[in-house]
């Protein structure tokens, strides 16, 4: 009986923690393909694939504006941070995602173990060359420190750095939408379904960055599931 109760408690804790760190679910309008699908079977013809050069060409002659970036699996490959957090705070479980001690570790130093994604380097360099304003909006729980802001500023050589916006997450609302709208962001780059919907709800374009196939954040999203444009070779 005690074993059964412990098992039920563990399952409920995992469900609760996952629910606390996920967006609402919006049904897709297209088939969509995960990064794993696209790596093994090639680029599907029914997904709108674009490159950084394509975006740069589209924006020629347009005045500078604000663009936004998600952090985890979009700007940084941060699986090492989350894997370490799970091992330390809730081995084989997900309750660490509701533990402020984990977020303080992640936000106040462990991000140094995150790897910058090449696609983020290319996008940020292109937008800065245009004079666009760069914002980082994450679904993470915030901490009383400025490490992630400084790390991103140094890693991507941000000229006019804004503090990272910690929007948190919710199962009942898209928490990033108001920040995208309030900062008049026109393009928001993200790997999650919620990033695409948040951008659209704010009147911006959400462009999909492919989540790496070996990310600890599973299941891997279906790229193109909302008919959004997807960046080529953006899984790394």
Swiss-Prot record:
Tell me which domain of life the UniProt entry assigns to the organism this sequence originates from: Bacteria
* Keyword Transcription regulation carried by entry: no
Q: Where does substrate bind?
A: 138-139, 176
Q: Which residues bind Mg(2+)?
A: 70, 72, 191
Q: What is the stated purpose of this protein?
A: Dephosphorylates several organic phosphate monoesters. Also has a phosphotransferase activity catalyzing the transfer of low-energy phosphate groups from organic phosphate monoesters to free hydroxyl groups of various organic compounds.
Family indicated by similarity: Belongs to the class B bacterial acid phosphatase family.
What is the protein's given name? Class B acid phosphatase
Per the UniProt record, the lineage of the source organism begins with:
Bacteria, Pseudomonadati, Pseudomonadota, Gammaproteobacteria, Oceanospirillales
Q: Which gene encodes it?
A: aphA
């Amino acid at each position: 009986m005690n074993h059964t109760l412990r098992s039920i408690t563990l399952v409920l804790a995992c469900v609760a923690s996952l629910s606390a760190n996920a967006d609402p679910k919006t049904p897709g309008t297209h088939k969509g393909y995960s990064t794993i699908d696209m790596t093994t079977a090639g680029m599907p013809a029914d997904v709108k694939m674009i490159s950084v050069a394509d975006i740069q060409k589209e924006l020629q002659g347009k005045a500078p504006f604000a663009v936004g970036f998600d952090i985890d699996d979009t700007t940084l490959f941060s699986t090492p941070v989350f894997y370490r957090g799970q091992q330390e705070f809730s081995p084989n479980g997900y309750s660490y995602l509701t533990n402020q001690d984990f977020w303080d570790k992640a936000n106040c130093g462990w991000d140094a173990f995150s790897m910058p994604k090449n696609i983020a380097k290319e996008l940020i360099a292109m937008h800065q060359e245009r004079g666009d304003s760069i914002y980082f909006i994450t679904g993470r729980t915030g901490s009383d420190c400025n490490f992630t802001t400084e790390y991103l500023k140094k890693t991507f050589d941000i000229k006019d750095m804004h503090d990272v916006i910690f929007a948190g997450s919710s199962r009942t609302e898209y928490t990033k939408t108001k920040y995208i709208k309030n900062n008049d962001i026109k393009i928001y780059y993200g790997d999650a379904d919620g990033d695409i919907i948040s951008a659209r709800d704010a009147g911006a374009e959400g462009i999909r960055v492919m989540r790496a196939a070996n990310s600890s954040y599973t299941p891997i999203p279906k790229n193109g599931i909302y008919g959004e444009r997807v960046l080529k070779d953006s899984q790394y």
